[in-house]
Amino acid sequence: MKFSSLIGHSGELLQLVRSSEKPADSVIDLFFRSHKYLGSHDRRFIAESTYGTLRHLRKCESLLKRALGDHALDMIPEDGFLLLVVTYLIGIEQRTAFEVTDLQPAVKSGKLKPHIGSILQSLSRPQDLEPTELVERIGEEYSYPDWMVRRFLDQYGEKDTVLLCESLNSQAPLSLRVNSLKSSVEECQQALRKEGIATERTKLSPF
């Protein structure tokens, strides 16, 4: 599937999740059931992009707001969710190899299309978040509500609050056990590598 289509599907799914009262995993499962033409690689990209954007939503919203500037007035809701996914991929995942042609076909607003290049350039430049107040700065950096950050600071102090927020908002690793009667660790790693999945041996149980 073309990259523009993957981005478009990711933006569509993010909008569905944000507008639904159901848990995100239920909405995503229903989305894939109704889009059976999506291959395994497409599904993985769309799911990871959606979950990642949700995990870093507050930071992505802040970065996108500054990148858009006055062009925010030209944006319709569908394009907003689309650009949030793009912001996550560029600002969080550091995927800077975006071309205007990757994004323009998925953008629906005719007024916004001519400015996609400048928006991508702005997102690709290193940006410091604006808030100078400690609670807001930590909240935006790690996408936590201010009230929760304030409570963490009261209990743990600044250093441990930053470590806690960073840890809790990181994607959890997945551990797999290999049945050595049927396969070896190397064979499993090779099979996963062919699917584009990077693995490493665990430190506590390497065999």
Sequence positions of predicted segments:
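Class I Rossmann-like S-adenosyl-L-methionine
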Residues: 1-207
